[in-house]
Structure formats: structure tokens, C-alpha cells
Amino acid sequence: QNPIEQEGTYPLPEAQVDRFMLKVIIDYPTLEEEKLIIRENLAGSLPKVTPVITADDIVEARKVVEKVYIDEKIEQYIADIVFASRYPDRYGLSQLKDLITFGGSPRASINLARASRAYAFIKRRGYVIPEDVRAIAHDVLRHRIGLSYEAEATNVTSEEIISDIINKVEVP
């Protein structure tokens, strides 16, 4: 999604949005980065890009990520986070009940587990810890939580709802 240029585009139905693993927010470059962009662009030279990894390396890394261990307690934690987005009152989050029209689907749980594995891999661990789940939860869930009219009217965001959930759900 490009939040600036939306003319001629249509919002995807919820079921199609749910098929995207992540919704990553990319901000503008910093002032220093933008000055570098200007400088390099005006110089007319394209930066030389040298590969740091091969296609075979990527395939191999994917196999390693699939082997990153997720304990049953972490699976329970992931399921609890997603269930709390559907049934907030069961998790002591009754204040969220009227703010959410729909919560994460089973696909949200699957993708939160997969993304947590990838995050653990990036952190050079062969196992997932709760901090991995918490670190990636916003990217996995922000597009999977439907906001009610009340939430929109009071400027409550999915980011805030996800933060409330991960701060309340018991960590194993």
C-alpha cells in the first residue's frame, strides 16, 4: 500500500489482506540520508551493487529458518495473542471489545509463528523466545485487526490495540 498515491486503487477485501504475511511501515529517509540521495543522484553515477548472497544461499537459509525451534509454550503464547485480538474480554482486555470488529485469523497465528522464527534466525538463535514474538507482532497483526467506528472516532489505532494485547497476555 502506498498511503500517498491511492487514486485508481481499491481497498482489498479483508480475506485478501489477510494473505499478506506482514504490513511493514516504511518512513521517509532521515535528513542525512536524503542529502546523500540528492548528492548521489546529482553525481549521475549509479552505486555499484555487489551481491552478498546467492540464490542458493537464500534457499539454504529458508531451510534453516524452518528448523528454528518453537516450544509449545511459545506456540501457546502466539495463539493467546491472536485469540486476545478476537476475544479481548477473555484476556482481561474488555476495554478493547468495542474497538475491534474482527481479530486475527488462524493465518495470523501461522504467520506470527513463521515471522518469529525468521526473527530468531536473524538474531542468530536456533529457538524462538517471547521477545521475538513481541518484536514482530505489530508487523504481522496491524492489517489483521478490524477497527470499529468507535475506535476510528476516538483515533485508536491497531498499533495501540496490539500493544495493549502483547502487554497483557501472559508471557511464558
PLM regions and their residue ranges:
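Residues that form generic nucleotide/phosphate-binding pockets
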Residues: I37, A61-V64, I81, D164-K168
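Short alpha-helical scaffolding segments that buttress acidic/His motifs in well-ordered protein cores
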Residues: I37-I38, I78, V82, I136-L141
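C-terminal engagement/docking regions of AAA+ P-loop ATPases
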Residues: Y87-P172
